[in-house]
Amino acid sequence: MARKTPIERYRNIGISAHIDAGKTTTTERILFYTGVNHKIGEVHDGAATMDWMEQEQERGITITSAATTAFWKGMGGNYPEHRFNIIDTPGHVDFTIEVERSMRVLDGACMVYCAVGGVQPQSETVWRQANKYGVPRLAFVNKMDRTGANFFKVYDQLKTRLKANPVPVVVPIGAEDGFQGVVDLLEMKAIIWDEASQGVKFEYKDIPAELQATAEEWREKMVESAAEASEALMEKYLGGEELTRAEIVKALRDRTIACEIQPMLCGTAFKNKGVQRMLDAVIDFLPSPVDIPPVKGVDENDDEKKLERKADDNEKFSALAFKIMTDPFVGQLIFFRVYSGKINSGDTVYNPVKQKKERLGRILQMHANQREEIKEVLAGDIAAAVGLKDATTGDTLCDPTAPIVLERMVFPEPVISQAVEPKTKADQEKMGIALNRLAAEDPSFRVRTDEESGQTIISGMGELHLEILVDRMKREFGVEANIGAPQVAYRETIRKKAEDVEGKFVKQSGGRGQYGHAVITLEPQEPGKGFEFVDAIKGGVIPREYIPAVEKGIVDTLPSGILAGFPVVDVKVTLTFGSYHDVDSNENAFRMAGSMAFKDAMRKASPVLLEPMMAVEVETPEDYTGTVMGDLSSRRGIVQGMDDMVGGGKIIKAEVPLSEMFGYSTSLRSATQGRATYTMEFKHYSEAPKNIAEAVMAAKGTK
């Protein structure tokens, strides 16, 4: 099957933003203008095409990144047909993991900002993730029709808060109720969209006289940014020559793809203005799969051996599975991005991470939650596969004759846990299946059984995250469950060095005995360094074959510390000495000796409890700043600063222990009459004060 669209005309893009910047509405308009959707879905009515899980429609929050394909020939029909694969990403901080994994497979992103709210806390998180993966981006300032809308203020915030380098390619005509359209700085014409056709038709007009000077000033800035792309252009520009439209577009494109600048546009998706011009900017400035460096990977048997794959149909097939979803009709769907080569349904793919071959069943292309079955996918495509049993998020799928492991995604450790139990005994088994399926879809969600109490414990990134998963269990799997009070994921570590601590396991019970003896030194590591084991045995005092057993004994003890049974982190163990018995020594005895030595060393090394600290940002009207700050302080929070918001109001930044944040949304709503909102994300672990540590230990029955 020949390609319908050359790969140079592919754009794999994400639409990402803060919660209420109007991202889903913007995506809806994109689908409408690209001719896929004939009736526009509004988030306000809970009918948006991209928000396809029932809960998203109820809450008006986008949770899962649905992937959709659309086609665009330019708003005036003046471009050859381009193919957009659009990934809608959630803007709520509990779902940051979703944003992160979509960033991994994107080639470019449209960052949507609210013209009133400007750059909000979540925007900074998303921006950092885009930096991490080197994703070229455009900025789209939405909601220009709202009271308090200010395009240039958002421009200033992009520079100061995100350290971005925005280059407006349009400026607004009017704002708030008076927002009519935009001045296109490339054409130096005003674009006015026709409201009767929902913005499908438009006309170019002369720039309003009162905007002429503003338009010329911003065009000059845009041309200067373009000239900085190369010395030849700079000479031409400084020599007073006009740069052509094609030269400006190519120069801005090169600089955008190099992540040096971000073209900036504006509009109001709700009133059908501006999104069309943004789609043209996606074609003009964002990269196709061949404009970015080839994807990198390593040999499956040798991490040092670097490999790469070009975005070309004739290369060997390679793809990354970036999302798993359970679909009510076809079962498990695995979304994957093809980086190189092509594959047909029915072909065999190899998963080097799991070292298994699997047959690719049906391949579906998604349009939000409608689907079309296709026979073949090519380099640059994003599709969903049915019938892969072993693949999980972050796995590579490739040609069995040319294995490659593409860069894995790193997922954060959960910070909050809750016990969950089914309301009826009959649901016990169903609950197990449901939880395992949800955990397969979402790598930041974990399920385990507490050995002591036998309870099922679920862990995730925040209260909302777990609430939504329990909700999904009820809707999708029909399992009603009760959940316990949230539990904080504390950790344990040590503050000083404990030298030469011994563990001796000796058992003499007629016949063959047991004998293991290990001496260790335990010392703290810097935060985040994890566990390290050093073998410093000299002269064979412990035979080689027993040393891994000592390490295993210690590793098996790490998940349950001595203070309150929490995992031990950031410690280094050096095995320095020991002894053995020719007959009685065995691996099990040395495992026990290692475990005993470690527990004893922990007691002697000033063990402490660590608690997760959260970065909390509260957006509040000015009248409530005192109340909010007082409340944060009473929760052991440390206020770190305060910023002004575009449309008035303040952003308060603080660091607060997670244990003090339960139920915060309710108390914040009541303290500010529902006018303040907050976001929170995990920052780091820090030592819990003595009274808190004692209370935790007492609750665990270890005090």
From Swiss-Prot:
Gene: fusA
UniProt KW keywords: Cytoplasm, Elongation factor, GTP-binding, Nucleotide-binding, Protein biosynthesis
Recorded superkingdom: Bacteria
InterPro entries given in the database record: EFG_II, EFG_III, EFG_III/V, EFG_IV, EFG_V, EFG_V-like, EFTu-like_2, G_TR_CS
Family: Belongs to the TRAFAC class translation factor GTPase superfamily. Classic translation factor GTPase family. EF-G/EF-2 subfamily.
Function recorded in the entry: Catalyzes the GTP-dependent ribosomal translocation step during translation elongation. During this step, the ribosome changes from the pre-translocational (PRE) to the post-translocational (POST) state as the newly formed A-site-bound peptidyl-tRNA and P-site-bound deacylated tRNA move to the P and E sites, respectively. Catalyzes the coordinated movement of the two tRNA molecules, the mRNA and conformational changes in the ribosome.
UniProt key word Protein biosynthesis: yes
Lineage: Bacteria, Pseudomonadati, Pseudomonadota, Betaproteobacteria, Burkholderiales
Any one of the GO CC terms: cytoplasm
Main location: cytoplasm
Gene Ontology terms: biological process: ribosome disassembly
Coiled coil: none
Name the record gives this protein: Elongation factor G 1
Organism: Ralstonia nicotianae (strain ATCC BAA-1114 / GMI1000)
Keyword field contains Zinc-finger: no
Pfam family, any one: EFG_C
